[in-house]
Amino acid sequence: MAKDYSRTQRIGDQMQRELAQLIQREIKDPRLGLVTITGVEVSRDVAHAKVFITVMGQDDAGKIALNMEILNDAAGYLRMLLGKSMKLRSVPQLHFHYDESIRRGAELSALIERAVAEDGRRHGDETED
């Protein structure tokens, strides 16, 4: 059975691809790090879009906040460029959000590895007795 793939999802996917290229090519701010767009959620009325990003190699909250500020300041410019590249009647307003899921996933993975190693040590100690 085919999965429902709504118009807003298609727009979000296309916006994700377009924004990745536009940020790389058009935003000339040297303070901007290596930004990865992890997802775009478009509202049902296509008036707003939440753009989720990560900054490669940045764990410092101050540097992440600076990157977010740069992108939010450039949101109008990026929206105008999106309007030229996408065939939409109205281009959604862009709202950039930092995506915590990758960092949380890495933390959970480290916790699981630690728990498995601890369990292995305990299990190894029990079999030697």
Curated annotation (Swiss-Prot):
Single GO BP term: maturation of SSU-rRNA
Alphabetized UniProt keyword annotations: Cytoplasm, Ribosome biogenesis
Localization per Swiss-Prot or TrEMBL: Cytoplasm
Major localization class: cytoplasm
GO CC annotation: cytosol
Functional note: One of several proteins that assist in the late maturation steps of the functional core of the 30S ribosomal subunit. Associates with free 30S ribosomal subunits (but not with 30S subunits that are part of 70S ribosomes or polysomes). Required for efficient processing of 16S rRNA. May interact with the 5'-terminal helix region of 16S rRNA.
Protein name: Ribosome-binding factor A
